[in-house]
């Protein structure tokens, strides 16, 4: 069986833990130092629902000064983790902006995304309630999961769930792609 590659992109504001989640998933290691990312890529092979998969993961810059680079990596992504920090409400407020930008770049009404509330281990500092996150998730029509990169809670589940979302999307898209291909095949050429 051919191993399918999935191009996943991790987006979100600065300091929300995008790199911590990604490195915890790839290397089972929690990064304690904050070193703003410009762009890092990682690869991991795993079995998701007993189907082998190769994940190409792009960890992106959250800082606004790198926002011009966002559209470039959004073009190639097949699935997106939209990460915010549960202890930083302003990072949560940015999630709809990231969703709109992805949909605009992809020229789609929907696309595979998973909203991730990181730092669920910091309950005493939490600024975004589960109810508020779930309401936004419903409004944006994006599934939601809470995780902790520090404690490795739901980290693997977030990436695996995103792959499941991508797979469902690709299966749903297949009839439309085949239909377009058949239409193109019926065109005739006329030489003058």
Curated annotation (Swiss-Prot):
InterPro entries: P-loop_NTPase, Small_GTP-bd, Small_GTPase, Small_GTPase_Ras-type. The modification Cysteine methyl ester is found at residue 189. A lipid is attached at residue 189 (S-farnesyl cysteine). The keyword Lipoprotein applies. GO terms for molecular function: G protein activity; GDP binding; GTP binding; GTPase activity. GO terms for biological process: Ras protein signal transduction. A lipid is attached at residues 46, 120, 147 (S-palmitoyl cysteine). Alternates between an inactive form bound to GDP and an active form bound to GTP. Activated by a guanine nucleotide-exchange factor (GEF) and inactivated by a GTPase-activating protein (GAP). Residues 190-192 form a propeptide. It catalyses: GTP + H2O = GDP + phosphate + H(+). A motif (Effector region) lies at residues 34-42. PROSITE patterns: RAS. GTP binds at residues 12-19, 59-63, 118-121. NCBIfam families: small_GTP. May be involved in endocytic processes and/or other transport pathways mediated by vesicle trafficking. May interact functionally with ROP protein. Ras proteins bind GDP/GTP and possess intrinsic GTPase activity. Interacts with hzg. This is Ras-like protein 2. It comes from Drosophila melanogaster (Fruit fly). The lineage of its organism: Eukaryota, Metazoa, Ecdysozoa, Arthropoda, Hexapoda. The gene is Ras64B.
């Amino acid at each position: 069986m051919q191993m399918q590659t999935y191009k996943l992109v991790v987006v979100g504001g600065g300091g929300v833990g995008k790199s911590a989640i990604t490195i915890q998933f790839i290397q089972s290691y929690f990064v304690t130092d904050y070193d703003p990312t410009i762009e890092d890529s990682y690869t991991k092979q795993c079995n998701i629902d007993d189907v082998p998969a190769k994940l190409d993961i792009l960890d992106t810059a959250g800082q606004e000064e790198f926002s011009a680079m966002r559209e470039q990596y959004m073009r190639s992504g097949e699935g997106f983790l939209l990460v915010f920090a549960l202890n930083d409400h302003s990072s949560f407020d940015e999630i709809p902006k990231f969703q709109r930008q992805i949909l605009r770049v992809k020229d789609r009404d929907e696309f595979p995304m998973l909203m991730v509330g990181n730092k669920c281990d910091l309950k005493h500092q939490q600024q975004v309630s589960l109810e508020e996150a779930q309401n936004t998730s419903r409004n944006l029509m994006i599934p939601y999961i809470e995780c902790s990169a520090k404690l490795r809670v739901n980290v693997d589940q977030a990436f695996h769930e995103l792959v499941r979302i991508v797979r469902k999307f690709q299966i749903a898209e297949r009839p439309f792609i085949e239909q377009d291909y058949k239409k193109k095949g019926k065109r005739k050429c006329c030489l003058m």
